Amino acid sequence: MHQTLGAVRLAYRSRIANLVKSGMIDNAVQVFDEMRHSSYRVFSFDYNRFIGVLVRESRFELAEAIYWDMKPMGFSLIPFTYSRFISGLCKVKKFDLIDALLSDMETLGFIPDIWAFNVYLDLLCRENKVGFAVQTFFCMVQRGREPDVVSYTILINGLFRAGKVTDAVEIWNAMIRSGVSPDNKACAALVVGLCHARKVDLAYEMVAEEIKSARVKLSTVVYNALISGFCKAGRIEKAEALKSYMSKIGCEPDLVTYNVLLNYYYDNNMLKRAEGVMAEMVRSGIQLDAYSYNQLLKRHCRVSHPDKCYNFMVKEMEPRGFCDVVSYSTLIETFCRASNTRKAYRLFEEMRQKGMVMNVVTYTSLIKAFLREGNSSVAKKLLDQMTELGLSPDRIFYTTILDHLCKSGNVDKAYGVFNDMIEHEITPDAISYNSLISGLCRSGRVTEAIKLFEDMKGKECCPDELTFKFIIGGLIRGKKLSAAYKVWDQMMDKGFTLDRDVSDTLIKASCSMSADA
């Protein structure tokens, strides 16, 4: 009898295996169901094996149903099946069931394998649950799951995406302390995150040992992030030195490397160096892309007549398929700066005829130009078009309008735009605050400017050198010298210096007030 039962059980298992092999999963489910409801005993092995099949086939609802049927029988999954189940559920983001499985594993004294652990961490970070990801990470470590370099990299990436720069650096340090060696992906996560947060010096310092020792073969992604970071910080010599070092160690600069340098050179009018980089690209066999040509167009717009720039776009860029919204926006801004708003608007219409999707930058240039000319009706029409297209004004747009209104003496309207910006959950930066503070000070409304200055500090938007200069200038004009001196002290505490002419004016005004007294 025992042999007969065993033979029947083996026959069921064989039928299920053959059906699975043939891709007939629904039929396999029917046979497994038949087996479960027969008089022949089904073992934990059978449940583990079949749930594993269902997970592999992404039949998660069936796998869940069978799992809950299995539990009251006193059966459990083995750690491997639990881990595969959790990994699969991460694809469909079924957090409730994942939590239940993790809880069951903890009760049984199991921990997920490193693959499931990392997949779950990655899901939490991608779903903006980075705080819970960190908590889960340390909880698993306490239970004996040793994280690998992938685990740390996932957390570092997630923390940087969430803007938690200090926490990301601490996770990196924890990785080093634990003896886990960083690889290229870990270094890239750290460097890209820090450079994005404008902390290029810290980024370089933290991977300098890997760069010098060549323990890790760093990719162009790491070097490009550092080069871009140094360029943004205005330290081109450091960027160029890194680019030279790349070539020496056999990590050849790529198109991104050259484009980053080109962008800096053209922005800073370093035309000879830009030409040298272009020549080097040709020698290296690197083909220019749309970004490269847009940098060239930007260069032409700085030194040539706008019409020549337009000809360059039509003759050199358009035949290569490199003429895009960036190209047109660059030209529109150039014609607007040259007070040729009609030509700029014709280019705008040309874009529409070609079916190009305009962006906020395009509209910002035109709206600013028409406002400058006093043509508010066209500016309003363009703003309405923006809204219809679903283009939300960004910080640059609002700041541009703010600056124009303040310079035109329309400070009350500017205040309205500033409040509208906040209502739309766009956080003003130092440039936005400076535009309004400057306008208020020029209008003799220094008390309101001071209030805005204090509000700025309360919002953790650090006043820069210009902010202090505007406030001090307004206080001097309002003959509030005592307050001006206090702000000057704050300015010096921040490491900023006052222009010689402003400091002289402040001292002279003080002397004059003393003499009158």
Swiss-Prot record:
Localization (cell): Mitochondrion
Repeat (PPR) residue spans along the chain: 8-42, 43-77, 78-112, 113-147, 148-182, 183-218, 219-253, 254-288, 289-320, 324-358, 359-393, 394-428, 429-463, 464-498
Cellular component, GO, one term: plant-type vacuole
Alphabetical list of Pfam families matching this protein: PPR, PPR_2
Transit peptide: 1-57
PROSITE patterns registered for this protein in UniProt: PPR (PS51375)
The keyword Mitochondrion is annotated on this UniProt entry: yes
UniProt entry keywords in alphabetical sequence: Mitochondrion, Repeat, Transit peptide
Disulfide cross-links: none
Family under the similarity heading: Belongs to the PPR family. P subfamily.
NCBIfam families: PPR
Record-given protein name: Pentatricopeptide repeat-containing protein At1g13040, mitochondrial
